């Protein structure tokens, strides 16, 4: 069942990409709450503090691969160590400029990764992902 309000986390060091992708998400007219994070470390900090802080749990995480500091691979490594209750119900989608087949295979080898798409995220791609992973 699709959640009434989708909480979507955008993990990308590029503020312009986050702005553009948030705008495309809003075009779907879904009830969404978007949380932009500029690094894997920021995203993990948010996820780790959800219980104490009352932060909204994301239902969908769009994760870039190439970021300074903790990149997407580092995020996935640390994410896999999180409590299963935190991971439960979260769909992780790699959102990257890389169309390298080897990169896609590597990403999809992570059990926590549900999908892999190349930038840019569009309204149509977002709607397809919602139809694929969240049923009304």
Q: Where does each model-flagged region fall?
A:
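Receiver (REC) domain active-site loop signature in two-component systems and cognate sites
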Residues: 67
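Conserved active-site segment of CheY-like receiver
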Residues: 13, 93-99, 120
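His-Asp phosphorelay/catalytic-motif detector in bacterial-type signaling
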Residues: 4-5, 30-31, 56-60, 85-91
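Short amphipathic alpha-helix used as the core "switch/output" element in two-component signaling
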Residues: 73-86
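Non-catalytic signal-transmission and effector/linker regions of two-component phosphorelay proteins
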Residues: 1-9, 16-22, 27-30, 121-136
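Active-site residues of response regulator receiver
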Residues: 63-64
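Alpha4 helix (beta4-alpha4-beta5 surface) of REC/receiver domains from two-component response regulators
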Residues: 74, 89-90, 98-115, 128
